[in-house]
Amino acid sequence: MRGQRLVAALMTALLAGCGPAVATPDPVPAAVGPAPERPYSVGMRQFTLDPDGRRPLPVTVWYPAQPSPAPPDVVDPPVDPAAGSDVSGPSGPHAAAALPSRPSVFAAPSGSGRATPASPGPERGPRVRPGAPFAAGRFPVVLYSHGLRSLPALHAALTTRWAAAGFVVVAPTYPRTNQRARAYTRDDVRNQPADAWRLIRHLVRLGARHGDPLGAHMAVDRFAAAGHSAGGHTTLGMFASGQPSPLRAGIVIAGGRMVAGLSRPLAPMLFVHGSADRIVPESIGRAAYARCLGPAAFLSLTGQGHGEYLTPGRPGFAQVLATTTDFLRWTLYADRAALHRLPTDATAPGTTLTTRALPT
């Protein structure tokens, strides 16, 4: 009965476009365990939302999976410099192969007796297993939006590592801005926030279906949104100006333009930007950061462009991975230790983290 009431309340909030704005509740509800101390294996599934509708939405889902019978090979496939080469999608250096997953970012138990997240270490990750059984439990959900002429698979170096850290990552392929779109137009970005909300409403309905293989493992009261470039614009467009939102957090990578009216989020926001980005200048991201009404952080990568720091092994990747993961752990798992790690996640030369109104 409690679950039915929760879903009803969420659907009311989603249909209305706003709802309770409790960004970092504490303690975590019983349906969600504490932030994981060890990385999960990663599975992947795909489905299409509204396949016969006006705007069909193919969706890729990466999720925490049960361990494989034998340890998987640990490898990040070679980067294909020809993939995702459009100026607002992942550029050549950012076009990571489709299957890399998160490296081990958790240390052995420390002197305190608790395992704590460590620096990412080698930029390698476990192989993604399509159709693998879900790990037990319910997990917070991150909706990830790709950039222009891009695809979810080109962002898997980051999104699969988030899945290994205990998040269900759902990534729609937007109908008119993806790499394979027949009727491509960048102007369609303004319609993508509505597409993203349509997907979230669908996920909430799945969470209400008894025994649904996906819905049974999603904490549908714990959503965040993230995206790169035009996907970052889409993410920002999901936050109505100055209004509470069912989204508990947002991550805007190399983005910040307003595509759906003025956006001044109340929820915690993290911005990631290269200082030498010529496609979406850092000033665009900083202006969006300045408009935030709630807790916000800005990770700047000195001398970097539009997304090379999203490729494993490139300068800044380890810091971006650590910062984004801890930001999600704080906002979706109420992990206070992750909040307190944020100032030290990006202390390498060439990275600077600025924060405003973060809890202490």
Name each region found by the language model.
Residues L154, R186-V220, G237:
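Alpha/beta-hydrolase active-site loop
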Residues V280-A290, G313:
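Short alpha-helix in the alpha/beta-hydrolase fold that links the catalytic acid
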Residues D26-P27, G303, G313-T360:
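Alpha/beta-hydrolase-fold serine-hydrolase catalytic core, especially in secreted/extracellular enzymes
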Residues P265, F271-H273, D277:
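Short beta-strand/loop motif that positions the catalytic acidic residue
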Residues T24-V142, R329, Y333:
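Domain-level recognition of soluble alpha/beta enzyme cores
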Residues S245-G255:
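A conserved short beta-strand
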Residues P69, R124-R127, G131-A181, R278-P281:
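Short substrate-entry loop that stabilizes the transition state in hydrolases
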Residues V204, G232-P244:
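Short glycine-enriched nucleophile-adjacent loop
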